[in-house]
């Protein structure tokens, strides 16, 4: 589950969860966005953060997806999430999550009355040092990341590595 961090017009931090998003290419991501306070903030600022929810942050991550900042201005305080300002984009970083991407919108696709697809460049990636592998890169197996399960309306723990991308399939050549 992705947590989208933005600032509103008054500089107040906001967060929402997004289930539909992924890699666009090596340096870009795509997120499917409905009409929310977050989409208003994205239109205003054009920059945001994307954090990865974990088992440990699941309750707060779920909360920010079911409560609108428009209706509850104290949403972030009630979530218990800790916030600092990003050094690279005009958006909040929620330090409770193990890894955060700082992003800048480069394109919106298929805009409609109900939402759009956002394509954003990844400006920087922050990772808590407790979640780094020996090579200094993020180790997602250490993070207890969760994903949204739309079939059973729940959250599932992501698993361990099971193969080598662009390699294991060569056995069938």
Regions found by a protein language model. Give the residues of each.
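Basic, polyanion-binding surface patches
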Residues: 1-173
